[in-house]
Amino acid sequence: NKALRVLANPFMDLDKITAAPSPSPNRWSDKVPSREMTVEEIQEFITAFGKTAKLLKDAGVDGVEIHAVHEGYLLDQFTLKYVNQRTDEYGGSFENRYRFAVEIVKEIKKVCGQDFPVSLRYSVESKTKGFREGALPGESFTEAGRDMAESEKAAKYLQDAGYDMLNCDNGTYDAWYWAHPPIYMPENCNLEDAEHIRRFVDIPVVCAGRMEPGTAARSISEGKIDGAGFARQFLADQEWVSKMMDGREEDIRPCILCHNGCFNMCHYKGVPNDQDLSDSLHLARCAVNAETMQTDKHHIVKTASPKKEHIIGGGIGGMEAARVLKLRGHEPVIHEK
């Protein structure tokens, strides 16, 4: 919708200087360093979060989730000592570093009411050695960001500030593969840490990040977490939950954790965020599901005149052709030597 771009351009403009808790390198471009945010800008953000939440509530939304103390995003950067070098009320001490996130939830509760649910996306541990240097599973390293001891304190502190749920994984932009686990990360790589942090709060804790459904279900049934988060699998197969409930696991089209399609909203043809929203070919597509974000182009319609179709070769292309032809109502026959 091009009209929406008049209201808000949801992409980074790398020709403009970006802002951060303290002067720092830009994660996306070495040519444009980040400057320090002013207190006035921080207050403007806090007010904007409250106004936006109120608009959503008035529109009938039941609650909001703040993408905040998570994956090295802005509010998370404020909490991390290796990024936040401020000496004012938003830097230094534990309370000051978490002040931004605390004041946001308090503002939302003030304008929307104490009973309006506010969830927080939360990285239990940063798993980060330093700028652009993350840690791998099982690696011995010195944590530059939030370690477990601080996280235990922070989770309780954020709960007491007003957050109603923690939606957990791990990592920062410097260790992004914990929050968006690719194929080389182990299944359930964030579960142990989420289960641990659950013991320090009285609010629901959700875990995300390459969750195996059976393991997630057991953890929930045992009371170790309260929910599991899935995203990429829904791009691969929108009906996968229904298929599981019907005992049709073998029919589920699995996410292959490749990031070749779903990350293109951020990296468009190798250039971060340089993209036309109308170009559905590169808008959160999926390598294993052609219909994802391209339903107008690839929507399967039943034929009015079924035919017997012969396909020479039973490779990946031949099998996909047979599958689609069958869904369209034809009778495909594969010939393979």
PLM feature spans:
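Flavin-dependent oxidoreductase catalytic cores
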Residues: 1-312, 316-332
